[in-house]
Amino acid sequence: MKSTLALRPVFHRLEPRIRAHVLLCWLALLLLSLALRPLLPVDETRYLAVAWEMWWRGDFLLPWLNGEPYSHKPPLLFWLIHALWALFGVSELAARLLPVVFSLLSLWGAARLAQRLWPQQAAGIGVLVPWLLLGGVFWNNFFSLLQFDLLLVLAALLAWHGLLTARHKPLGGWPLVALGIGFGILAKGPVILVPVLPALLLAPWWAGSAPAPGWPRWYLGGLLALVGGAAMAL
């Protein structure tokens, strides 16, 4: 504990520099990926083909592939691709900007979540978490891929932040949980419940103390958030 307290001023002084290094490292990895790696079959090429056929048909509700409805994935990723095409024109590069945004937001969201979970070590952990992700094999494998996985990560992070907020501010926290679940369902289906539901149900073991309204209202709020998220995705 003493060593942590002693390091706290050091982290405060180095935090801006470390954050800049994280951004530079992320940018270098990103530019290398965009410059040296084409869209990978089968997944990336298929998803871009679905987005293009929806755009060509003018049908932005139902995904299409090769003249048939494509029901394998929800439409959120395709909608976001269309939004970028509407802004920057139809191109492969515009579509590949999406994982750029997803990866940067996931770095920030994970660091902020760690700071909220361990506030006594916020200065240090806020700059270490992005480095842990940047050095991880799985994050580096997905951070530039035009797929649904990082979008699902962002939805889970939003729901987790909502759970932390709901401990003390239910009216502010549960809508965030519902949004996270809804976006997760639109991103990759009910698999969003795999990271979110255990955190919700096991809150007495990680929360440290009972939420302000008590545990019965906690679980009632969680149920309403689940219903709201599911309704949002319908």
Residue ranges and their predicted role:
Residues 2-234:
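Membrane-integral, polyisoprenol-dependent glycosyltransferases
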